[in-house]
């Protein structure tokens, strides 16, 4: 046997024999270390804690602890000083006061666990608590241990004093027997258990009856204190097996009926019994962990509330993101928030004059070919404010000056896009688009009387604004007809400066004829409002009937 031992084990055996332990005592101690059948988790299956090489002592540890005279330390006491004096726990005094055979067995069980490796015992107790859903608060209430110290000892193997470990092991042994009795009770005795539980609840609500019922010689203060602490009801805690069943049922039905909830109760209790290693027919032994229909109903109600709350948070986050993303678009896209690019000391907009090089001229030429007609006009504007349009832009005529743009660059050429789309769908209508000053309308009215009226859409883009524009005054002198159409801009007085753009497509396959007669000359510029008009041939007669003394504001579509 010696040959199978390591050098460390041989040294430990030699130290034990040299300390006065005889061979018979050592063999008897080894026999007592064998696990009992009803102990629960076997200690042999648990690994040893690192660095624990002390051989278990064979002296009866429990009796030396309960009398308060033992000063020696066992394995696990090193570094366990936490600064407080821990007297003999009441649970140990209570077990010492009992002289029954069951109490003797419990004391022997505690002595055996104290002689084992503390880390292995801690893992065994932790596994048992998880298996039966026992909270650490219950251990703290019964043993008087510090919950933080208890948690570190069970999870990390933090060293603990021998007295504290003895109190923990005593609770563990008694809890094992208590749960075993609960599951071993027959169905006939379930009624007695119900009466006892109701009596315990009454004593918990009215503790004065418990004090009156106890005689002076029945039990001392040390024995009654743990009993009063045990009267505290444990909070119900869902086990992992039951939670898995409930979440699967929640995916199928978020609001089950009463019959479905009762079926879930049976299924959960069955799973809890299988988790504890007992028959499902002994579900009444679950005690405070018994699943009821009310608890299932509350679980589903809480899940629905949590889901609704998460959806509300998601909607609020989505709305806030949409608001933040729209604010820059509104600030940059609104026509009333665009800053002017012209200096403040200069006149914003475009100036117009009737003399010298600043004169604004327009000419019109009428060309007929079948049922189509086109009027072209050109306006050359003087640039006053800084221009933001490239001189090489394709919207400028080859021989014309740069168009003055106030308030920023030109908007996208949506008008031309619409014209091109119309030309693809109805090329006949796209040939009748006319852009001319209102003064030219009076001149060409007679020539268009014989033309067939067609419905041609009027296209006018005012940078997305639907407000009326202030007319721009033009001089009414007409010149040669061979000029390209230009777009112009009219600043509004009651709104921010916005670029006005109008475009017209030239007549396809049109024939330009020589100018034979001059249209009527109009010397006074206030006779007609000089707003640029984009219209069709059917609306020319309507425009000619308008009063020449009134202004005709343009509206944007």
UniProtKB/Swiss-Prot annotation:
Top-rank taxon: Eukaryota
Major place of residence: nucleus
A Gene Ontology biological process term: negative regulation of mesenchymal cell apoptotic process involved in mesonephric nephron morphogenesis
Chain positions found as Phosphoserine: 49, 52, 75, 80
GO cellular component: cytosol; nucleoplasm; nucleus; transcription regulator complex
Pfam families membership: HNF-1_N, HNF-1B_C
GO molecular function list: DNA-binding transcription factor activity; DNA-binding transcription factor activity, RNA polymerase II-specific; promoter-specific chromatin binding; protein homodimerization activity; RNA polymerase II cis-regulatory region sequence-specific DNA binding
DNA-binding region, residue intervals: 231-311
Gene3D superfamilies, per database record: Homeodomain-like, lambda repressor-like DNA-binding domains
Region called Dimerization, residue ranges: 1-31
The keyword Magnesium is assigned to this record: no
Keywords assigned: Activator, DNA-binding, Homeobox, Nucleus, Phosphoprotein, Transcription, Transcription regulation
Segments forming domain HNF-p1: 1-32
Biased composition (Low complexity): 328-344
Biased composition range(s): Polar residues: 351-370
Subcellular location(s) per record: Nucleus
Record's keyword annotation contains Phosphoprotein: yes
Span list, region Disordered: 64-85, 324-370
Domain POU-specific atypical: from-to ranges: 93-188
Subunit structure: Binds DNA as a dimer. Can form homodimer or heterodimer with HNF1-alpha. Interacts (via HNF-p1 domain) with PCBD1; the interaction increases its transactivation activity.
Biological function: Transcription factor that binds to the inverted palindrome 5'-GTTAATNATTAAC-3'. Binds to the FPC element in the cAMP regulatory unit of the PLAU gene. Transcriptional activity is increased by coactivator PCBD1.
Similarity section: Belongs to the HNF1 homeobox family.
Listed name of the protein: Hepatocyte nuclear factor 1-beta
Organism of origin: Pongo abelii
